[in-house]
């Protein structure tokens, strides 16, 4: 548990992972400095300010990955930093300058800020499975020694390619800098993060994870042979590794593997009202699962708490509660209403 006097900084604190991590850090007794791009934008920060203990243990700081040195003030005096912020624009017209360079330079800027502060004992970076397995031919099992093929990403330009390139190059540059400058740096590599959430808008990872419900066909390839982790498990692993004195290097954080067919079978059973497709253009009916090994994380003592069903039920419930996905009216109710001419219903 953190001490009340121990301050930690969370970058990208208003986002999907960042806001949940802030909530858990506050619960664990830490004083949190949360960086956001615009602390005055109530729509973007209200879910942080409404958290229990926010009034006494949370402060918001203005910082942007594109502005060199903008994290220095927030990090000064902190004993730990959780760098979660990352550009997540899959549709960028200028990916090199809008996504890739800001990600690399932003992470190096955080490392430099930690050096300048002289108080930071550990920096935890939220990396991505996109740094591990994006290559022409999938292996059956991936671990922390694997890296994505950047040239393959640049040549094929699949959905999200600039995100995979940016995270891979940023993490590699950071490892070089951390080793040269003797910084205690660890990276956590989540697979696709699913679960309930605090932010008001649709998290990018749920646009992908819920793509069979949302009919986002361009994202089906990403979950063809998918790996998943619950948002809460991921955030608790950040705190666990930060607090563990022997944690070092990279850690894959993934609790479940599922092909798109296995995922859809579960979703159709839970949500028949969405009429989720069972056939996917260009995707073989007989897929072998691809496994991301969390052996290293488990061996240091971390335990996952949530099932695949927990993740998706939590995500769908949160999206429905926030009005981000429609709640369809069951067909039998629609038919009954039409027959009685009581109401003109549109199935969502």
Curated annotation (Swiss-Prot):
Database matches in Gene3D superfamilies: NAD(P)-binding Rossmann-like Domain (3.40.50.720)
Alphabetized UniProt keyword annotations: Flavonoid biosynthesis, NADP, Oxidoreductase
pH dependence: Optimum pH is 5.75 with dihydroquercetin as substrate.
Gene Ontology biological process: anthocyanin-containing compound biosynthetic process
Entry's EC annotation: 1.1.1.219, 1.1.1.234
Outcome when changing residue 347 to A: In strain: cv. M9
Oxidoreductase keyword on record: yes
Residues that, per the record, bind NADP(+): 44, 163
GO molecular function, one term: flavanone 4-reductase activity
Protein's job: Bifunctional enzyme involved in flavonoid metabolism. May use dihydroquercetin, dihydrokaempferol, eriodictyol, garbanzol (5-deoxydihydrokaempferol), dihydrofisetin (5-deoxydihydroquercetin), naringenin to a low extent (10%), but not 5-deoxynaringenin or butin (5-deoxyeriodictyol) as substrate.
Family: Belongs to the NAD(P)-dependent epimerase/dehydratase family. Dihydroflavonol-4-reductase subfamily.
Name this protein carries in UniProt: Bifunctional dihydroflavonol 4-reductase/flavanone 4-reductase
Phylogenetic classification of the source organism: Eukaryota, Viridiplantae, Streptophyta, Embryophyta, Tracheophyta
